[in-house]
Structure formats: structure tokens, C-alpha cells
Amino acid sequence: FVVMTSVGGRNPQPIASRQWGAGFLPSRLQGVEFNSAGDPVHYVGNPAGTTRDTQGRLVKAITALDRHRNRVINDPETATRIAAYEMAFRMQASVPELMDVSKEPKHILEMYGAKPGDGSYASNCLLARRLAERGVRFIHLYHRGWDHHGGLVKYMNTCCSLTDKPTWALIQDL
């Protein structure tokens, strides 16, 4: 599953990655964090000077070694590592296209209130729709401005104005 944390809000409290970790379950069940601005996923791009073909051969070689090792030790975490390498390789090609919302119609951007690349909750809602269209089964959107310990009357409109419209748009768009 994919996790996205938006920027902005009244009181952007930190959110720990343990909230989408697998805990005591196998690590294949943990979430993949997408950054809401900048590079969508850390360390998915090829190193400088490495072509996609070279990277593909490297992933195949590592997979072969991991499969050989797994026949000996039969560790579920090895199978998870193989799947993670393969997923990262596929993501190198698919994530840039996913994150490019420049071809979205203007009325869709307006419906969400999204400004591409700003890292807002609205932009993340639009990306969530695009992820769902590509088969991602679980998408968790965090908006970090909801930790109210006071000032509800003063700040509720601010928080709702950042989330109501894009949430409605996402539901309508699905």
C-alpha cells in the first residue's frame, strides 16, 4: 500500500513511519511512503551513469542470488526482499508518469483545488485517484494539521478548507 503525507495545515505535527510499518507481521505488508513534493520515492532513481538496461540486469542477478539463497534457508524475508527489488525496478518507470499530472484536465485540477507539485492534501487526493486507477489497493492519506488540543472554533474552518473540497472531489472522481 501507499502512504502520502501532505504539507501545510495549522499545526503540522510529525508522523512516524512506524504508523505504516508492518509491526510483527511480515515486512511485505508495510506501506511505501510517497513524498508529496520533490522525488516521490527516495532512492528509486538509477545512480548517475546507470542505464535502465544495466539496472535491469543487476536486479535480475541479485534476484537469482537471493532465490538461490532462499532455496537453502527458506526465509520469507528473502522472498520479500526479492519482491521489493522487483517492485522498485518497476516503479522507476511507472512513478514518474504517475506523478505527472500535467495532462489532467483543468476542470479536474480545479475540482480538487490541486496545484501540481505543491505537496498539498488536494494534490495528494488527485494522486490517490491516479494510484487507485493503476491498481493500488490501499492508499493512506495523512494531513498533519488535525492535532487539536484547543482553539477548535478558531481553527476548524482553516483545517476544513484544506481537506473538504479535495476529499469530496476524490470520492466523486472514483
Q: What is the role of each PLM region?
A:
Residues 1-174:
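Ligand-binding pockets and gating/stacking loops
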